[in-house]
Amino acid sequence: MEFAGKRLKGLIAATFTPMTSNSDINLPVIKQYVDYLVQKQHVRNIFVNGTTGEGMSLSVQERKCLAEEWVKQARGKMDNVIIHVGCLSLSDSKDLAAHAASCGADAISIVCPSFLKPSSLDALVLYMKEVAFAAPSLPFYYYHIPRLTGTTYQICELLRKAKENIPSFRGVKFTDVNLMDFGLCVSQYKEFDCLYGVDEQLLGALAFGAHGAVGSTYNYLGKKNGDMMAAFEGGNLQEARKIQCSLQEFLLFVFDMGWGLPEFKDIMSQISGIPLGPPRLPLYSSVKSDHHDSIRTKMLKLDLI
């Protein structure tokens, strides 16, 4: 089967999973979330149940319910809903892939298993093929995030093998700082969508020819990142650098506080006004109410909101 249709491009928000105070999934919030992304952040693509969405901490049934609701609420408003279906269990991944196809998702993606890891690149591609064949009508993307999976195969070589073995393969979500490998993916496999996943280095990836970007900060800084992409595409490198440096300064402020994914969920709630709730254990947010003013002040100073 050939997939010669639409390409994934532009910004793709890696969505947080809304939860109640008891850390149960909170489906009614998703409509408000979709409207906020489209109307306030000008983001029309989402990546659901990935790292930002705490996908590995959710049950298969929860992930199915979330996929259905995101697809339902995005219909007619968004361009693409990509469902991450990666699990530690191959059968669960195949089940989620088939479900994503049945509920109307636009594409699927999987991350490399991170406990019992594939022993070789060939084994990983075989694993990918099994999942892709469970939803042969959907474009399939590999999600590369070696910092969490511990799997460091060269992705330009993975693209070659995937091209030979997986008819529905369409590209990679590349969440790593290795811009040489990323650049080779872009230059050697122009038929694939190469989506960059390190928000603070997006401008560098654009210089290498990134087709788009998937990230958590595009939930609440989507418009500003869109401005940076427009400046780059228009040849205004000075403005693009200015915006990227402001975004980096904000992220450095956050990282220096020792914060990560749990705190980014809190920041999204604060900036958007959407009640996303807490992360699910073992994640735990250390943001206190007295931090909110300093976060907003920093973002205002950097002209990010």
Swiss-Prot record:
Aceneuramate binds at T51, T52, T175, G197, D199, E200, S216. The active site is at Y143, K173. It catalyses: aceneuramate = aldehydo-N-acetyl-D-mannosamine + pyruvate. The gene is npl. One of its GO terms (molecular function) is N-acetylneuraminate lyase activity. Disulfide bonds: none annotated. Catalyzes the cleavage of N-acetylneuraminic acid (sialic acid) to form pyruvate and N-acetylmannosamine via a Schiff base intermediate. It prevents sialic acids from being recycled and returning to the cell surface. Involved in the N-glycolylneuraminic acid (Neu5Gc) degradation pathway. It is found in: Cytoplasm. Pathway: Amino-sugar metabolism; N-acetylneuraminate degradation. One of its GO terms (cellular component) is cytoplasm. SUPFAM superfamilies: Aldolase (SSF51569). Its EC number is 4.1.3.3. This is N-acetylneuraminate lyase. The keyword Lyase applies. Homotetramer. GO terms for biological process: N-acetylneuraminate catabolic process. Keywords: Carbohydrate metabolism, Cytoplasm, Lyase, Schiff base. Belongs to the DapA family. NanA subfamily.
